[in-house]
Amino acid sequence: MDMEAGKTLTNEEVIRELLELLKKNAMKEQANDVFEICSYVDGLEKKIDSMTEELTNMQNQIKEMQEDTLVNNAKKALSEAQERLNTRREQIKSQVLEVKAQVKSTAKSVVDEGKAKGRTALYRVSEFLGIKKRLLDIRENVRGAIKTTDKDIAKTALLA
């Protein structure tokens, strides 16, 4: 896992601290929501790592293809599809890293304020709902990338 030194969001100290603070203040449902969001971000990071590996394999296979007209057409189509997918993966990776940073900074802010002002400050945990909306948007972006890739694969299969 190459994203941010491979540390999962669920293992971040500030996230653990926030979860503990929420549980101590009988806010188990909010703690579960925060943990669910963090787990989802961790899962997205793993999927992006898998995409990276698949794209690398795809690129290596394209390089190994033989030289003839039909294969060259398929090779060109595959290369274009691979480039589009790689661009999409980079965009998604960037979005996930932004969300991860947002989760960490929101958690730190809520924890710091919770320590200073007590339980009422912990209700700011509702800010995580905005992050959840962003994650749902990223999920739609991933689904779009999958559909585009499936179409590219189908087109390439027709060439072969």
Region locations from a protein language model:
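Leu/Val/Ala/Ile-rich N-terminal alpha-helices, chiefly Sec-type signal peptides and the beginnings
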Residues: M1-E90
